[in-house]
């Protein structure tokens, strides 16, 4: 890939500027709308940050394709050929609205369907997790992360989305029972971070492309398993039930769930 270091520098700059937009919004009233249901929210800040990212990408890389959470229905992406940016301006919008914390901003960069760079920015903690196969490393700001210990299920905390617990989807309650405990954060980016750093042993949820792309790049760079458990093919442009875990935990989990 051409000048990936230039892309890396640009994306980091965009994320820092987006953080300023988001933090400045805390002093203003939010316009909050619902999308697919009462818990699926979008705010004027989500839209503003996505517009900012799109403008920066189009200025720097006019040939690039863009898939953004808030514009995906207007400008759907049909293939991953060429330079592709996948955007989630505010991941965990409910947390952003209700808590003013526990949310992230995420960008993933692909080239000809190959992962290059992933970015998950914990806005409040000012912690940027970034890296990918072009660096063969993942960092939190300037600190390089170690590959997480390949622990078994019983040794770690699991993270699941609410429906998997409430409805026992795929039999995930058995996974909870076999683990050291359950945690739920309501933000895919932060839950990916917990697995990247070894704080939790797995994360499973129904994820859309913008929820998944950046975390998948970072997790696979750290030798973690990222797999769709409801479909055979991993198409980055479709929603799917995703499990990210250590290799040993993944083996334990697949023995317990029903697919």
Model-assigned labels for residue ranges:
Residues 28-29, 103, 131-136, 220, ...:
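A short, compositionally biased
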Residues 123-154:
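ATP-dependent small-molecule kinase catalytic core of the GHMP/sugar-kinase superfamily
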């Amino acid at each position: 890939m051409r000048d990936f270091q230039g892309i890396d520098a640009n994306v980091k700059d965009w994320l820092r500027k987006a953080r300023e937009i988001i933090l400045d919004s805390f002093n203003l009233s939010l316009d909050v709308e619902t999308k697919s249901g009462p818990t699926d929210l979008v705010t004027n800040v989500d839209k503003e940050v996505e517009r900012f990212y799109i403008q920066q990408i189009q200025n720097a890389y006019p040939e690039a394709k863009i898939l953004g959470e808030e514009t995906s229905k207007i400008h759907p992406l049909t293939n991953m050929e060429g330079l592709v940016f996948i955007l989630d301006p505010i991941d965990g919008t409910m947390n952003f609205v209700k808590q003013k914390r526990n949310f992230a901003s995420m960008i993933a960069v692909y080239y000809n369907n190959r992962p290059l760079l992933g970015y998950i920015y914990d806005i409040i903690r000012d912690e940027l997790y970034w890296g990918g196969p072009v660096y063969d490393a993942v960092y939190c700001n300037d600190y390089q992360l170690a590959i997480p210990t390949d622990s078994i299920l019983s040794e770690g905390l699991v993270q699941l989305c609410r429906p998997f617990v409430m409805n026992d989807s795929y039999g995930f309650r058995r996974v909870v029972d076999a683990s050291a405990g359950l945690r739920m954060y309501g933000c895919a980016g932060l839950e990916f971070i917990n697995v990247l750093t070894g704080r939790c042993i797995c994360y499973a949820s129904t994820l859309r492309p913008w929820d998944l792309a950046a975390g998948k790049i970072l997790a696979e760079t750290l030798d973690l398993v990222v797999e769709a458990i409801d479909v055979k093919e991993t198409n980055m442009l479709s929603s799917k039930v995703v499990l990210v875990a250590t290799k040993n935990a993944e083996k334990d989990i697949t023995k317990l769930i029903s697919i």
